[in-house]
């Protein structure tokens, strides 16, 4: 058994990847599934679309690899975080669609919690801010809006879970109702200091404890899959939320090690070791993957519009035909010509947290070309990520000596060079950029003895290319100051319509 199977359940598609012992990809399969938008600001998934697409990709990846489930040493799961579902324990039937992490319907519940003065207590206990993003208010909304939901929960008839819990329930035909620390820490119900569900927060949200899954370390022998699904029973050895899994897949095992995922948005995580650092700079504190008995924590910040700015250049401005064309267009000019692009189409995320900020392109002149705007758009991804890393540096107890990167936009050399220039530290792209799935595979491997420990996994990590800063720190500081001035402009109260 020389292989590991990783399930990577994302927001728009499910994937499965077969890895060999060296952490190389042997085969992969992907399947998209429908998104449902019943009302503005609402986003839902059909739980069975998630399960069926995930199972189909597992079978397809094994077939493509010309391997069977019996050849797999273990199975690991990584998943879109916070997305919330509730199902009947007796039948496994969901009582409502999955409410997705992007869904904003619970803002009124969040506002009432803030009005009760719970914000500081929630931050202290969970590391999170009160926001519809996290699972707790989504769970409360389902219980409030499904007939008999709260009564059935009190009788122990219902189960709550994030996506990982739902997949394990299906894979084991309802034998296991579990999650891991990284997913639990995104619910706004898990006390990251005690490592337990928080009874006071459950009372505040009127959530019955019988709903909640058992929580285990991320690397743990959770149980066996039903043999009927894949032709043989597999040990479920790893579970982690997608961003923590990517941190693990990047072998960021020591305090001060950080990774940034450049996707539609950007997610930066910094390992803070066994300390849950309380952020004073607009970041959240979260559980990192736990592969042994010792707890591990991370600081996290997210950028709402990362690679999505390139999609806007393609679909909104029609400046490029394919997203990949942006690098050539941006490289057609030596710099942005003084143009700064602030892509706050949906407000600004960490560390600014300004939902009212609007997008802007500033510094335009008669000599501005589409090349300058494309370059400014790419640079905006690096500027926002720089603001995150600077906030982390202010919060963190250890210095950050390099940034490991992954995600689709990490293929863009111009972006990564500019990122290194702004940060003044090396930016490193690994050989295997499927780090999210790789993290789940590594966790499963450690749990089952396929790998000895984190040290063995760390030896496998290989850099593909390192980008070193080439501009002076004075020049970098000047560019960052220009960015912050542009951000200040989009955060001014709007005078439109007056």
UniProtKB/Swiss-Prot annotation:
Sn-glycerol 3-phosphate binds at residues 11, 81-82, 133, 242. It is an enzyme of class 2 (transferase). Glycerol binds at residues 81-82, 133, 242-243. The keyword Acyltransferase does not apply. Inhibited by fructose 1,6-bisphosphate (FBP). Gene3D superfamilies: 3.30.420.40. It comes from the Bacteria. Key enzyme in the regulation of glycerol uptake and metabolism. Catalyzes the phosphorylation of glycerol to yield sn-glycerol 3-phosphate. This is Glycerol kinase.
């Amino acid at each position: 058994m020389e292989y590991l199977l990783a399930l990577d359940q994302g927001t728009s598609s499910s994937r499965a990847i077969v890895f060999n012992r060296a952490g190389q990809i042997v085969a992969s399969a992907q399947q998209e599934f429908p998104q449902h938008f019943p009302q503005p600001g609402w986003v839902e998934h059909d739980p069975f679309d998630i399960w069926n697409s995930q199972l189909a990709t597992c079978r397809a990846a094994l077939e493509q690899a010309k391997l069977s489930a019996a050849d797999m040493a273990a199975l690991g799961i990584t998943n879109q975080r916070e997305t919330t579902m509730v199902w009947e324990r007796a039948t496994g039937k969901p009582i409502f669609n999955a409410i997705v992490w992007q869904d904003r319907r619970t803002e009124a519940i969040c506002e009432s919690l803030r009005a009760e003065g719970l914000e500081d207590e929630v931050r202290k206990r969970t590391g999170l801010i009160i926001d519809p993003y996290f699972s707790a208010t989504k769970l409360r909304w389902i219980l409030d809006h499904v007939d008999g939901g709260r009564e059935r929960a009190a009788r122990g008839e219902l189960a709550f879970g994030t996506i990982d819990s739902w997949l394990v329930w299906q894979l084991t035909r309802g034998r296991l109702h579990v999650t891991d620390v990284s997913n639990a820490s995104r619910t706004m119900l898990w006390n990251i200091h005690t490592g337990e569900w928080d009874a006071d927060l459950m009372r505040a949200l009127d959530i019955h404890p019988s709903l909640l899954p058992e929580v285990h370390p991320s690397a743990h022998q959770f149980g066996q899959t039903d043999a009927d699904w894949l032709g043989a029973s597999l040990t479920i050895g790893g579970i982690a939320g997608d961003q923590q899994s990517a941190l693990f897949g990047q072998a960021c095992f020591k305090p001060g090690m950080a990774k940034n995922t450049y996707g539609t948005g950007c997610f930066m995580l910094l390992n803070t070791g066994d300390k849950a650092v309380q952020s004073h700079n607009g970041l959240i504190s979260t559980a990192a993957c736990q592969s042994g008995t010792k707890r591990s924590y991370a600081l996290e910040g997210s950028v709402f519009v990362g690679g999505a700015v390139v999609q806007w250049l393609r679909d909104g401005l029609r400046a490029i035909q394919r997203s990949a064309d942006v690098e050539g267009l941006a490289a057609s000019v030596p710099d942005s010509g003084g143009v700064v692009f602030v892509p706050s189409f949906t407000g600004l995320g960490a560390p600014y947290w300004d939902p009212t900020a609007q997008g802007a392109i500033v510094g335009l002149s008669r000599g501005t070309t589409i090349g300058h705007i494309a370059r400014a758009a790419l640079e905006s991804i690096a500027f926002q990520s720089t603001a995150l890393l600077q906030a982390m540096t202010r919060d963190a107890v250890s210095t950050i000596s390099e940034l490991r990167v992954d995600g689709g936009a990490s293929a863009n050399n111009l972006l990564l060079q500019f990122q290194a220039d702004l940060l003044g530290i090396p930016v490193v792209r690994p050989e295997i950029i499927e780090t999210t799935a790789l993290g789940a595979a590594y966790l499963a491997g450690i749990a089952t003895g396929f790998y000895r420990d984190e040290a063995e996994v760390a030896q496998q990590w290989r850099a593909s290319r390192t980008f070193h800063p080439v501009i002076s720190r004075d020049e970098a500081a000047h560019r960052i100051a220009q960015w912050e001035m542009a951000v200040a402009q989009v955060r001014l109260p709007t005078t439109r319509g007056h």
